[in-house]
């Protein structure tokens, strides 16, 4: 499954993996998974976190290593994001629920994920997605970017 990913996708997933793997030991624990999910406004129980880990923990050691993470991401990409998942993701970014993601909102979520971006990087991300040029990302623009991944 993971062998159908491009090099770009793999390096993107490596970056995502390192956001989760806070201590850099090459494994994602339930604690690390919980930290990231809470920073995104989710509130999973210990049992839910354990279930998520168990779902992809091929070797049964209780953590997710990078190959297991890649398999998870490849599977997730195959069941391309449902409308509901996209709406949920958009809501995470659209803090004031006004239907637009501003540069400030994008920076806020990325900072919560531990991703410190310069103003230029944030502006560049907005520009890439901002089809109508109004300086923010609406839902349709967000969907386009997510589907292009």
UniProtKB/Swiss-Prot annotation:
Coiled-coil blocks: none
Residues that bear N6,N6,N6-trimethyllysine: 116
Record: residues binding Ca(2+) 2: 57, 59, 61, 63, 68
One Pfam family linked to the record: EF-hand_7
Entry binding sites for Ca(2+) 1: 21, 23, 25, 27, 32
MF-aspect GO terms: calcium ion binding; enzyme regulator activity
Tissue expression as described in the entry: High expression of PCM5 and 8 in stolon tips and stems, moderate in roots, and low in leaves. Steady-state expression of PCM6 in all the tissues tested, except in the leaves where the expression is lower.
Keywords, ordered alphabetically: Acetylation, Calcium, Metal-binding, Methylation, Repeat
Positions of modified residues (N-acetylalanine): 2
CDD domains: EFh
Residue positions binding Ca(2+) 3: 94, 96, 98, 105
Induction pattern: PCM5, PCM6 and PCM8 are not induced by touching.
Record PROSITE patterns: EF_HAND_1, EF_HAND_2
Domain EF-hand, chain residue ranges per copy: 8-43, 44-79, 81-116, 117-149
Gene3D superfamilies cross-referenced by the UniProt entry: EF-hand
GO cellular component, one term: cytoplasm
Protein residues bound to Ca(2+) 4: 130, 132, 134, 136, 141
SUPFAM superfamilies for the chain: EF-hand
Additional comment: The expression of PCM7 was not investigated.
Known role: Calmodulin mediates the control of a large number of enzymes, ion channels and other proteins by Ca(2+). Among the enzymes to be stimulated by the calmodulin-Ca(2+) complex are a number of protein kinases and phosphatases.
Similarity comment text for this entry: Belongs to the calmodulin family.
Protein name per Swiss-Prot or TrEMBL: Calmodulin-5/6/7/8
């Amino acid at each position: 499954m993971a062998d159908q990913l491009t090099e770009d996708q793999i390096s993107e997933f490596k970056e995502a993996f390192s956001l989760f793997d806070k201590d850099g030991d090459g494994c994602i624990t339930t604690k690390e998974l919980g930290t990231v999910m809470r920073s995104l406004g989710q509130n999973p129980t210990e049992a839910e976190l354990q279930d998520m880990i168990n779902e992809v923990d091929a070797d049964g050691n209780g953590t997710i290593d990078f190959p297991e993470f890649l398999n998870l991401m490849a599977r997730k990409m195959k069941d391309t994001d449902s409308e509901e998942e996209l709406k949920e993701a958009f809501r995470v970014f659209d803090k004031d629920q006004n239907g637009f993601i501003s540069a400030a909102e994008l920076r806020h979520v990325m900072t919560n994920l531990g991703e410190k971006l310069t103003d230029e990087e944030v502006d560049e991300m907005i520009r890439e997605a901002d089809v109508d040029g109004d300086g923010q990302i609406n839902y349709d623009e967000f969907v386009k970017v997510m589907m292009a991944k």
